[in-house]
């Protein structure tokens, strides 16, 4: 992609298990036919958790993963700026079972549309400045908790006890301190989770408008 081509960056934030990944993947799949398979991509904020390979597993488990300090937003900002300039980047790969980055990376080439999704995207003014549209998934916390328990136990090798403990100690408090207040920076607030068809269509139309502007 040349520097003359616009790169539209859309950020989708909200609580853990609020439907961010679902709505991001839905928009991705439905827009590919319009913009081209190789011209739209998704970046997950989780990939930018800081490398903790120098820490013991016991120390890694104690990290507050719902606090902005756990994330390498410096690198994420750098990668978004590079993609906007037409340069490819190496997106880190994060292991939920090892609680650190792996040695693998995924090459992302420049795109016309980049969809970002993550819990703390709207808390960082540098990231907000790079986004052309911002979305907040306003899903009730009790629903998020049920989804999180199911996901983390089935997909991330967690126990129910550890998931509930983390929710009480860090997930909910950090949501109230950082994530919920960041809702004020959203252009679009989406209720009822990632299957909200009207919200999906509105987002797709807005992205199409941004591509034409």
Curated annotation (Swiss-Prot):
It comes from the Bacteria. It catalyses: uridine + ATP = UMP + ADP + H(+); cytidine + ATP = CMP + ADP + H(+). Pathway: Pyrimidine metabolism; CTP biosynthesis via salvage pathway; CTP from cytidine: step 1/3; Pyrimidine metabolism; UMP biosynthesis via salvage pathway; UMP from uridine: step 1/1. CDD domains: UMPK (cd02023). One of its GO terms (cellular component) is cytoplasm. GO terms for biological process: CTP salvage; UMP salvage. Gene3D superfamilies: P-loop containing nucleotide triphosphate hydrolases. Its EC number is 2.7.1.48. Pfam families: PRK (PF00485). It is found in: Cytoplasm. ATP binds at residues 14-21. Keywords: ATP-binding, Cytoplasm, Kinase, Nucleotide-binding, Transferase. GO terms for molecular function: ATP binding; cytidine kinase activity; uridine kinase activity. InterPro entries: P-loop_NTPase, PRK/URK, Uridine_kinase, Uridine_kinase-like. SUPFAM superfamilies: P-loop containing nucleoside triphosphate hydrolases. Belongs to the uridine kinase family. This is Uridine kinase. It comes from Vibrio cholerae serotype O1 (strain ATCC 39315 / El Tor Inaba N16961). The gene is udk.
């Amino acid at each position: 992609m040349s520097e003359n081509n616009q790169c539209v960056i859309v950020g989708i934030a909200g609580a853990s298990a609020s439907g961010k990944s679902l709505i991001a993947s839905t928009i991705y799949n439905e827009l590919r036919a319009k913009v081209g398979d190789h011209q739209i991509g998704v970046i997950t904020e989780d990939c930018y958790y800081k490398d903790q390979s120098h820490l013991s597993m016991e120390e890694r488990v104690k990290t507050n993963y719902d606090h902005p300090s756990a994330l390498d937003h410096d690198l994420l900002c750098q990668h978004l700026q590079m993609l906007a300039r037409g340069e490819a980047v190496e997106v880190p790969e994060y292991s939920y079972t090892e609680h650190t980055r792996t040695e693998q990376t995924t090459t992302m080439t420049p795109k016309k549309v980049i969809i970002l999704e993550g819990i703390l995207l709207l808390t960082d003014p540098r990231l907000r400045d790079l986004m052309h549209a911002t979305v907040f998934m306003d899903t009730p916390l009790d629903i998020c908790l049920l989804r999180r328990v199911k996901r983390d136990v089935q997909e991330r090798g967690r126990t129910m006890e550890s998931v509930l403990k983390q929710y009480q100690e860090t997930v909910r408090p950090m949501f109230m301190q950082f994530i919920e207040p960041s809702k004020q920076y959203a252009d679009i607030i989406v209720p009822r989770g990632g299957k909200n068809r009207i919200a999906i269509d509105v987002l797709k139309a807005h992205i199409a408008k941004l591509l034409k502007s």
